[in-house]
Amino acid sequence: MQIEASPPSGNSSTIEKYDLSKKAYVLVLHHYEFKNKEHNRSGSMQDMVQIKKVLTDFRTDTLKIHSNLSLKSVQRAMDEVSTKDFSKNSCLIVFIMSHGDTKDTIMAYDGEMYSFQTDVVEKCTMNATLKGKPKIFVIQACRGDAEIQTDATRKIISDKKDIVTFQKFHKHQQSPQHYKNDLYSVI
């Protein structure tokens, strides 16, 4: 299967073609239990069951689920993604479920926040075997009251053109659990 993606008007006259004949690699960062029990996300396991159910209908090679990782463990997992060989995969799909906050940060098990842009997107886009392949992000987390910002002292050199991010809620909005009907209609 091939999918054609037209660039936004004014950017380029070429059309990107993605070869989706290979299976997708799916990574899930599922944070539902936290060191501070007040942050536990009851009901989140039902969302995970639905994600697994939906993905059985798709051509997925691997469903790699990381549950309740600390900040350092999330960073290690994403470092592995940055160097993993995805040449046998057509695309990368990343699900993130947790609490979120300002500047598109996401809460890890230990209550520490990691950056969606720096700790997740950057690690995926720097992987050479994902170049020219879709990288799809589905996030279930509140967004806080700020937009994504990058650290001006850090050089971001990876290619960001093959990314699709689904975030059901805009900044300043709460993100209720059991969003599956809306999410799955998008997928």
Regions found by a protein language model. Give the residues of each.
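Mature extracellular/periplasmic domains of secretome proteins
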Residues: 81-83, 123-130, 154-158
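Short coil/turn segments at secondary-structure boundaries
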Residues: 38-43, 67, 78-79, 106-110, ...
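A short helix->loop->beta-strand "cap" motif at the edges of active sites that frequently abuts
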Residues: 132-135, 161
